[in-house]
Amino acid sequence: MIRSVGLTKKFGDFIAVDNINLNVNQGEIFGFLGPNGAGKTTTIKMLTGTLRPTSGSIEILGMDMKNRAIEIKRRIGVVPDEPKIYEHLKGYEFLEFIMSIYKLDKAEMKVKIEELCDAFEIDYLDKLAGEMSHGMRQKLMLISVLMRKPEVLFLDEPTVGLDAKSAKILKELLMKYAREGATVFMTTHILEIAEKMSDRVAII
């Protein structure tokens, strides 16, 4: 599902990521553990096609990122470490915007959104994103990705800003999606989170 060989990223003379080799299987929750500044976010950006590697190869869902990036991006989901939500949109408007991008069925998505909002105990979809706390925006971003059930899910420090109960709910949802065949790649700087939420852990 997720493969990389010799993945390297340099910014001038600075080596941000050096020779990363990954092999993540379908239905696996893979933890990528390391301290802040170790290159976790840079690695995810390369794996998801938002940052071009200096060298190395990436394969997602059996497709080469160099040649089929557009198709790959439609079949994966990404939750960045900083939720990127337009501050002038209300929560439900942001979710409708995501539906329009991916041409999702609104009736079907409404059911999934209600299920996820109930799970995360969210009752603020009529609030402007700019008025939400980091934790609120993080949950909204998670819902916007989880509602469409991507085949591969990339999560960059997903528990930051979440309380213990919400983190537990996220773990249960990820385990459910993995059982259904989805693949999860998750970064964290917390060893306990990596051990509790992952099937395997790699350290950078």
Stretches found by the model and what they are:
Residues 2-4, 9-203:
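ABC transporter nucleotide-binding domains
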